[in-house]
Amino acid sequence: MALTWNSIISAEKKKAYYQSMSEKIDAQRSLGKSIFPKEEHIFTAFDLTPFHDVKVVILGQDPYHGEGQAHGLSFSVLPGVKIPPSLRNMYKELAEDIPGFTIPEHGYLKTWAEQGVLLLNTVLTVEEAKAHSHAKFGWETFTDAIIKKINDDMEGVIFLLWGAHAQKKGANIDTSRHFILQAPHPSPLSAHRGFFGCKHFSQTNELLRKQNLSEINWGAVTSS
């Protein structure tokens, strides 16, 4: 039977760590706390990028914790929401790296996901206005399992690991089967230390070309 995200996620949901985590999150919701993203958006990355379509993984940390920002894709925000600083810096690098790239007026990265870019956060929920509030709830175990499945069952996937957190998360990726591109995080705190000029977007397309796979059209960032 072909592997699907549905079968992979269903197997994780049966495990004790996941059930314990769900109880913690449900308890917070029942106390009236705002948890982002909305429940129906937690697994958006998997909905938009089927397992066997994954070509690239861009690993984020935890969801944006402001109202209306997080919608289940790392670094992305819904149309109409102000572009966050890290994504703005990603756009700046794209404008330097990819000929003809025009910086969009929104931060909605759905079209990347639909082309095979898994926009995966390490932690998939957060409490409003409390960064990293759901770290250690169990999401790290879940996303380790996701990365392991890609590592074990796919070949030639390109992992973009920006910053120490992502690089540590990707430490067990088999580089004889996959590709890793590392740079500092695009955050304003670190982008000038080597994210700008890393050329990861063009390098990704070069690696895809060498595998006879279609390139990512990074410039196809539409707001619908």
Swiss-Prot record:
Which InterPro entries does this UniProt record tie to the protein? UDG_fam1 (IPR002043), Ura-DNA_Glyclase_AS (IPR018085), Uracil-DNA_glycosylase-like (IPR005122), Uracil-DNA_glycosylase-like_sf (IPR036895)
- Is Membrane a UniProt keyword of this protein? no
- Pfam families the record matches: UDG (PF03167)
Q: Which GO terms describe its biological process?
A: base-excision repair, AP site formation via deaminated base removal
Q: Corresponding gene?
A: ung
Task: Name the HAMAP family for this protein.
Answer: UDG
Reaction equations catalysed = Hydrolyzes single-stranded DNA or mismatched double-stranded DNA and polynucleotides, releasing free uracil
Protein name, per record:
Uracil-DNA glycosylase
**PANTHER family from the xrefs?**
URACIL-DNA GLYCOSYLASE
Its annotated compartments are: Cytoplasm
The free-text function statement in the UniProt record for this protein reads: Excises uracil residues from the DNA which can arise as a result of misincorporation of dUMP residues by DNA polymerase or due to deamination of cytosine.
Highest taxon listed in the record's lineage = Bacteria
